[in-house]
Amino acid sequence: MLNKEFNKENPYIEFKEVYREEDYFDIIELGVYYYSNNGLNKRPYKITRVDILNKDKVTSPRLSVLEGYIKSWNESIKNEKYPNDWQLFYLYKEIFQKLIHNKDVKQCYNYFRGQSDSRYELIPSAFRSNVKKDFLRDFEGIYEELARLFPNRLTYHELSKQKIKDRETQLSLLQHFGLKTTLLDITSNPFVAMLFMLSENIDNYKEPTLYFFQLDKYADKSKIFVEVVKNEWNERIIAQRGAFLNFDWAILPSENIEQDMDAKIPTIKLVLKFDEKELQETLQASIQSLLDIGLSEDDAIEFVSPLENEYAKDNLKSMDLIKKELMEKLHEYFYSEVDLFPDFEKRIQYISSQYNLDLNKQLNIESK
């Protein structure tokens, strides 16, 4: 992890400026590719393959193990092993079995995070690009003032080695009630992570993403990892099987950290992607068939070009149907968005959102 001294006056501002995901996470990116599947009595999408997206950048010994898994997954896809109506869900289940419940592997992946778009970095909400510097500058004052106004709910603890464990408990409450903090939400349940991955409405093309983390809560190198301490105010976090990665640990002066902060968290980023390669092969095959019947190359290309736009529209429809299909299957396994909100205020908000006429205004339950 990054070993740097931060300005004591405004450490959050400086941390945001230098933060890089790769300084904290050793990420192997996997793509699950799908393709729009037109025709009567067909599922509207087809899973084509699983592949490694950043193979040329990976130095981790985990790579060879993953390559073996990918080979078996692709064989299952090729042989149409998965049930016709639920192809993607069962592929996810098989991926979970290999990465999470595999007795042949010493250390499996035990924490997860779902994000609706692969372009989003693994970064706590306080440090995201849509947050003003003023918030980071004023954060301590905001926290201190809230603790003064609501002493029965919140206690202020400064950012220091002596107070960090007490502070992170209070930060988890602030995040629970909607304030952006230095905590990154994760969960011990991959199906809950899937709910978050699918939480946003499909109004443009996005690549839903699941993260898998190897976190040993008893190892010094994972001290950035925080389990939630249950109390009367955090029912929602407990329902979500929640935990956090606390980046206050990365901001503390290095002499105060009795741990190996050079250790990065082994991570897999699983991205659902439209298969552009399959599209180009389909278009080329269409062009070739027109050439075979005597059309000129220019005429053949002109004739086929509109098909690319049609596939783009079909792709958006396919993604929307994939989301609905996965959510329906999660409901069959008794995982539902409403269960993520056991506390009174959030449950009321969620129920109200289901009756909004404007779907774009529905409650966004993405991880903070």
Residue ranges and their predicted role:
Residues 1-368:
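Catalytic-core elements of nucleic-acid end-processing and repair enzymes
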